[in-house]
């Protein structure tokens, strides 16, 4: 797919529903008593993998176009699957469902695509094993495919080495099936959608600082969920408006959960003109409309506790830094190496191909901004966030940019290119 420089981006857009919340709505709805109704569900490939997995576990899920209905069977209503669960490209599905399956009364095997088969699963296998789970890497390499023999679990107090919502959520979900209380402490607070939504469904979840605790014994009850727009999808339009001169974009109804809104804070630190309008609250999640205008940016240092709040948006930050005056430093972001691709290496190589002055480090990147970018052949490595980042970067660069594997955006944003084209007209 070919992209070229564009004139000002103007208009209003509504981005798809939040991917993290969409995944969890299916999982928690399946474990609840009664029918959970979900509107603005993200029908990206990852979330559809979650639906397929829970259908294979005996849950009736209806897709009525305008809404998703999950006919839950309670915490102990899942049944043994008829075949290996296919998680596709979804790390969220893999890690969260493993916590649920660890406490069932049957054995499950799960696998995914080539990317999933290289992503680290020891980070969930170790705490689940401490809880009494029987979970193994079938190839004995710490990655999928996984085999999980359901067991009687017991609560633990676990200190995680990484600030990962997937690890935390996996342990908390296993904790619903454990004897005694389970707690997870992180080095920094990761996104907290699991804690918010499980509380909404009736679970006994408490949070203090970077520790989340679940006490089992309460049934979950069906809910009505309105999924806010995904700030990770909004990020590309935020960046495009900031990069392309004279642009102004209004992005409607975006989730601005403080554990997810690090991009807004970093962009504003860089000098971005971003205004929050119509701030609201629904299902425990804050939302707002975002009005973004082209801005002159300057370099910043991005590190520490802000990293988990924008881990998926760091490729966008790296691209924005190329258009900012001065130096931008990203550090404490080792997690970028174990995403759908090694996002440090991929961003460095692709931005260099476009003329950027960028160096990779063991835990991030250093970018010298202010040098003009030019078109190049970009390898997305079939990573949706890489493809979308370079699609918008090309709009502010000279010449033609060709993106290999551009259709991988269907993982999280099937209509991305259509929305981008509409704003560029």
What are these regions (language model features)?
Residues 1-425:
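Structural preference for solvent-exposed beta-strand-turn elements
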């Amino acid at each position: 797919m070919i992209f070229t420089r564009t004139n000002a981006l103007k208009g209003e857009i509504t981005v798809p529903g939040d991917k993290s919340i969409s995944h969890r709505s299916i999982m928690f709805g399946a474990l609840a008593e009664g029918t959970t109704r979900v509107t603005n569900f993200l029908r990206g490939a990852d979330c559809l993998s979650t639906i397929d997995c829970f259908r294979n576990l005996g849950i009736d899920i209806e897709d009525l176009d305008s809404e998703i209905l999950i006919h839950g069977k309670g915490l102990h209503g899942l049944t043994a699957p008829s075949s290996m669960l296919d998680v596709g490209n979804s790390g969220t599905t893999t890690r969260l469902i493993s916590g649920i399956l660890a406490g069932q009364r049957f054995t499950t095997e799960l696998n995914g695509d080539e990317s999933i088969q290289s992503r680290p699963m020891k980070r969930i296998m170790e705490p689940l094993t401490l809880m009494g789970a029987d979970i193994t890497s079938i190839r004995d390499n710490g990655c999928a495919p996984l085999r999980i023999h359901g067991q009687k679990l017991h609560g633990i107090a676990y200190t995680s080495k990484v600030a990962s919502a997937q690890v935390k959520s996996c342990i908390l979900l296993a904790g619903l099936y454990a004897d005694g209380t389970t707690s997870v402490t992180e080095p920094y607070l990761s996104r907290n959608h699991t804690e918010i939504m499980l509380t909404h469904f009736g679970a006994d979840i408490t949070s203090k600082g970077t520790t989340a605790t679940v006490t089992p014994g309460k049934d979950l009850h069906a809910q009505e969920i309105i999924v806010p727009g995904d700030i990770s999808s909004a990020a590309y339009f935020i960046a495009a408006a900031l990069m392309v001169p004279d642009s102004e974009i209004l992005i409607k109804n975006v989730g601005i959960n403080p554990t997810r809104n690090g991009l807004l804070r970093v962009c504003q630190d860089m000098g971005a003109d971003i205004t929050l309008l119509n701030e609201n609250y629904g299902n425990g999640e804050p939302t707002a409309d975002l009005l973004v205008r082209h801005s002159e940016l300057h370099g910043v240092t991005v590190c520490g506790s802000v990293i988990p709040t924008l881990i998926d948006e760091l490729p966008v930050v790296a691209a924005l830094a190329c258009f900012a005056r001065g130096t931008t430093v990203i550090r404490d972001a080792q997690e970028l190496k174990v995403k759908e691709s090694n996002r440090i290496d991929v961003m460095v190589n692709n931005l260099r191909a476009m003329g950027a002055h960028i160096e990779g480090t063991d835990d991030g990147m250093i970018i010298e901004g202010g040098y003009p970018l030019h078109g190049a052949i970009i390898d997305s490595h079939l990573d949706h966030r890489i493809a979308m980042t370079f699609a918008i970067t090309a709009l502010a660069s000279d010449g033609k940019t060709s993106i290999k594997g551009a259709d991988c955006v269907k993982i999280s944003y099937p209509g991305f290119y259509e929305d981008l084209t509409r704003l560029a007209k």
